[in-house]
């Protein structure tokens, strides 16, 4: 039996246009990004006296819709690519990709190709989780492919006469990883001849979503004080670098260890924490991977930067760290009044594993059409988000 590949289809409200894409996720390999190639079917009626365009836009939204009603716009277009697919322009003619060749044979003479090449300095798809009472479009970065007919590409477009699909730009974990993180710190206290030594290490550098983070802790308490509390947290850091220098730190998982370390004593232990969105569903401002409405999402993946890359064009940068905090105090009833905090931080990378390469020798395509439907709890979302 011949092998087949799924192709995604979305039609305009009036049924006159339909866009076909081979995928919804396009991989940023750091040094290049996969091209966005597809086909658009144009009703013969539209081919008489109309121009048809396809665009790819990357937009960073950093404010709510209701602010736009009073004349304030809290969104910035980071990239806008466009091409006129009908009538086709001779200077834009390019060889068909393997996908386009197969779709051209399947769809017939009313199908026209388009292809966009994104630059490597665009951010990946990411969104900030709204609070329970928030409505409207979510803050974050999204990518939209749109097809429409107009006299020119800047004309105001009717949603009925256009078709939009949300796609995602994603990164996957690198195949080659560095050594596991290990950090040591020493704290000298008054009235103690010797210091407190803390060593924290992770079992590896890169973790996949849903995978536990393994942490080893060693404490050499050579002081006259007592380690009264030990707390381990996994924190997500989001730098909003496009319009401000805002930095958001969110604890995504935490464990308090019921252990004390007496004066002149040692302690060691191994712990495991798993950062999951399921445990942080109502945490406002948490960064998530860009969401396609028909699928679930997860905590945002770590941002991987190309050496020398300008961070400010990326909109939002996401990173993770493990923090181990100790509360050190003197013994006795009044000891807590003079307590000190000792903290150790270790960065790590949280990403999806790289999937198996796409098959290029497929013999047929299977078309999956997207229904226009609203999901529960998505009131106020634009229709394009259902794509």
Swiss-Prot record:
<dbReference type="InterPro" id="IPR000698">
    <property type="entry name" value="Arrestin"/>
</dbReference>
<dbReference type="InterPro" id="IPR014752">
    <property type="entry name" value="Arrestin-like_C"/>
</dbReference>
<dbReference type="Pfam" id="PF00339">
    <property type="entry name" value="Arrestin_N"/>
</dbReference>
<dbReference type="GO" id="GO:0001664">
    <property type="term" value="F:G protein-coupled receptor binding"/>
</dbReference>
<dbReference type="GO" id="GO:0002031">
    <property type="term" value="P:G protein-coupled receptor internalization"/>
</dbReference>
<dbReference type="GO" id="GO:0007165">
    <property type="term" value="P:signal transduction"/>
</dbReference>
<dbReference type="GO" id="GO:0007601">
    <property type="term" value="P:visual perception"/>
</dbReference>
<dbReference type="InterPro" id="IPR011022">
    <property type="entry name" value="Arrestin_C-like"/>
</dbReference>
<keyword id="KW-0844">Vision</keyword>
<dbReference type="InterPro" id="IPR014753">
    <property type="entry name" value="Arrestin_N"/>
</dbReference>
<dbReference type="InterPro" id="IPR017864">
    <property type="entry name" value="Arrestin_CS"/>
</dbReference>
<keyword id="KW-0716">Sensory transduction</keyword>
<dbReference type="InterPro" id="IPR014756">
    <property type="entry name" value="Ig_E-set"/>
</dbReference>
<comment type="similarity">
    <text>Belongs to the arrestin family.</text>
</comment>
<protein>
    <recommendedName>
        <fullName>Arrestin-C</fullName>
    </recommendedName>
</protein>
<dbReference type="InterPro" id="IPR011021">
    <property type="entry name" value="Arrestin-like_N"/>
</dbReference>
<dbReference type="Pfam" id="PF02752">
    <property type="entry name" value="Arrestin_C"/>
</dbReference>
<comment type="function">
    <text>May play a role in an as yet undefined retina-specific signal transduction. Could bind to photoactivated-phosphorylated red/green opsins.</text>
</comment>
């Amino acid at each position: 039996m011949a092998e087949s590949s799924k192709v995604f289809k979305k039609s305009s409200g009036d049924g006159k246009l339909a866009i076909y894409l081979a995928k919804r996720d396009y991989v940023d390999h750091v040094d290049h990004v996969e091209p966005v190639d597809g086909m658009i079917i144009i009703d013969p009626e539209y081919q008489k006296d109309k121009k048809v365009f396809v665009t790819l836009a990357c937009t960073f939204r950093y404010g709510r819709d209701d602010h736009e009603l009073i004349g304030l716009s809290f969104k910035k277009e980071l990239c806008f690519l466009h091409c006129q697919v009908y009538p086709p322009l001779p200077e834009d003619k390019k060889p068909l990709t393997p996908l386009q060749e197969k779709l051209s044979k399947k769809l017939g003479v009313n199908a026209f190709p388009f292809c966009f090449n994104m630059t490597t300095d665009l951010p990946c798809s990411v969104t900030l989780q709204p609070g329970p009472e928030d409505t409207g479009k979510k803050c974050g970065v999204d990518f939209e492919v749109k097809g429409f007919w107009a006299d020119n590409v800047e004309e105001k477009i009717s949603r009925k006469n256009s078709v939009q699909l949300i796609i995602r730009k994603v990164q996957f974990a690198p195949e080659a990883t560095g050594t596991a993180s290990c950090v040591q710190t020493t704290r000298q206290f008054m009235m103690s001849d010797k210091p407190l030594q803390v060593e924290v290490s992770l079992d590896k550098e890169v973790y996949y979503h849903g995978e536990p983070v393994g942490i080893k802790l060693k404490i050499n308490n050579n002081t006259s004080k007592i380690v009264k509390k030990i707390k381990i947290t996994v924190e997500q850091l989001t730098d909003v670098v496009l319009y401000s220098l805002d930095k958001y730190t969110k604890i995504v998982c935490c464990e308090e260890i019921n252990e004390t370390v007496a004066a002149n004593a040692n302690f060691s232990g191994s712990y495991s924490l798993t950062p999951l969105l399921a445990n942080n569903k109502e945490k406002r401002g948490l960064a998530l991977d860009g969401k396609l409405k028909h699928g679930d999402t997860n905590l945002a993946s770590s941002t991987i930067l190309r050496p020398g890359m300008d961070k400010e064009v990326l909109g939002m940068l996401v990173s993770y760290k493990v923090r181990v905090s100790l509360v050190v105090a003197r013994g006795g009833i009044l000891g807590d009044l003079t307590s000190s905090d000792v903290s150790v931080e270790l960065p790590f990378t949280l990403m999806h594993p790289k999937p198996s390469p796409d098959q290029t020798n497929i013999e047929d395509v299977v078309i999956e059409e997207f229904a226009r439907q609203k999901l529960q709890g998505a009131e106020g979302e634009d229709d394009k988000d259902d794509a």
